[in-house]
């Protein structure tokens, strides 16, 4: 609630780094005064451009977007480190978290992921 007691709308920008067009839209949304915070995706292809844009817009609050799925067909994400228990045969994250009968074997929960491997990979960073 705002100071007047009226509800307050908070808008958070999402997926910075995903695509060039997403980066442009995120920064435009911030510069237009619509939002003041963004989530950046370090695993995304346009992450380097996103970092450059963030440096040019120091007033933008930044958070990390945790990515462990890669649901789009033509845009894929993969881990920053070697973590094969979370990836498919091509090294990309699985497209969904939970099983879907229409897409057998395509969820993380159907795989034999190794928490020790994940912990070791995260400790390297």
Predicted regions and their residues:
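Boundary/entry segment of secreted carbohydrate-active catalytic domains
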Residues: 2-21, 25-26
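Structural preference for beta-strand elements that scaffold enzyme active sites
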Residues: 8-10, 35-37, 59-65
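Active-site beta-loop-alpha junctions enriched in small/polar residues
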Residues: 14-16, 41-43, 65-71
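A short alpha/beta connector and helix-capping loop motif
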Residues: 20-45
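Acidic (Asp/Glu)-rich catalytic clusters
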Residues: 26-32, 47-61, 79-88
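The substrate-binding groove and active-site-proximal loops of carbohydrate-active enzymes
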Residues: 36-37, 110-113
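Active-site gating loops and adjacent loop-to-helix segments of metal-dependent hydrolytic enzymes
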Residues: 75-111
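CE4/NodB-like, metal-dependent polysaccharide N-deacetylase domain
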Residues: 116-125
């Amino acid at each position: 609630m705002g100071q007047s007691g009226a509800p307050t709308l908070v808008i958070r920008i999402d997926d910075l780094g995903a695509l060039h067009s997403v980066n442009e839209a995120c920064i435009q949304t911030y510069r237009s005064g619509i939002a003041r915070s963004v989530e950046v995706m370090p695993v995304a292809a346009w992450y380097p451009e996103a970092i450059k844009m963030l440096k040019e817009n120091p007033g933008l609050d930044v958070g990390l977007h945790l990515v462990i799925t890669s649901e789009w067909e033509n845009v894929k994400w993969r881990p920053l480190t070697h973590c094969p228990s979370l990836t498919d045969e091509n090294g990309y994250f699985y497209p969904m978290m939970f099983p879907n009968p229409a897409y057998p074997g395509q969820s993380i929960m159907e795989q034999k992921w190794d928490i020790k491997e994940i912990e070791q990979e995260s400790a390297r960073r």
